[in-house]
Regions:
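N-terminal catalytic or cofactor-binding beta/alpha core of small enzyme domains
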Residues: 1-123, 132-145, 151-173
């Protein structure tokens, strides 16, 4: 029997005006399973927390979840080298020597439930994507990476089912 793939699944705690984050509820409601490492990161621009998770867990693939103000679930196709904290008027680069855009590498299919997005915004979701994809690229790691944005008011049960389906597909690939 094949050993289960090590999948790093992460989301974020509360941030800004949101006292709750749907990604926390989804991650907590998923059953424990072999090979699945679930992490809820604080919503901060702290590069080390993302790199350390990659180094410590040594995943075969990574799936990030983020809360959005959008109306539909979106699969993010790239991370952009920019970040902006609440009080900053202009975005800043995440990496002064990094590429402008980094493509996600985990082909995610969520059926008719999701759209495809080319911008994960300027906040922590995009920051985490960029930092992890940049680390994977710089160290030539064979770790497929994907990211899904889920609306903050989306049906939690349905969102959890969709994430479970994605995780099952990841185990099979």
């Amino acid at each position: 029997m094949n050993k289960p793939k090590r999948i790093l699944l992460y989301g974020f705690g509360p941030y800004r005006q949101f006292r709750d984050n749907i990604t926390v509820r989804i991650i907590k409601s998923l059953p424990r399973q072999a090979g699945l490492k679930k992490i809820v990161f604080p919503a901060r621009f702290h590069r080390a927390q993302f790199v350390e998770a990659l180094k410590r867990f040594k995943p075969d693939m990574v799936l990030g979840l983020g809360q959005s103000a959008r109306r539909r679930i979106d699969v993010e196709s790239q991370a952009i080298n920019r970040r902006r904290a609440r009080r900053e008027s202009k975005p800043k680069p995440i990496s002064l020597r990094g590429r402008q855009r980094l493509k996600t590498t985990l082909p995610l299919k969520i059926g008719n439930h999701a759209g495809k997005s080319t911008s994960a915004g300027d906040y922590v979701c995009n920051f985490s994507m960029y930092v992890m994809l940049d680390h994977i690229r710089r160290y030539d790691l064979d770790i497929p990476y994907g990211f899904v944005h889920i609306p903050h008011d989306y049906d939690e049960t349905e969102a959890t089912r969709l994430v479970e389906t994605v995780l099952l597909r990841c185990q099979r690939t």
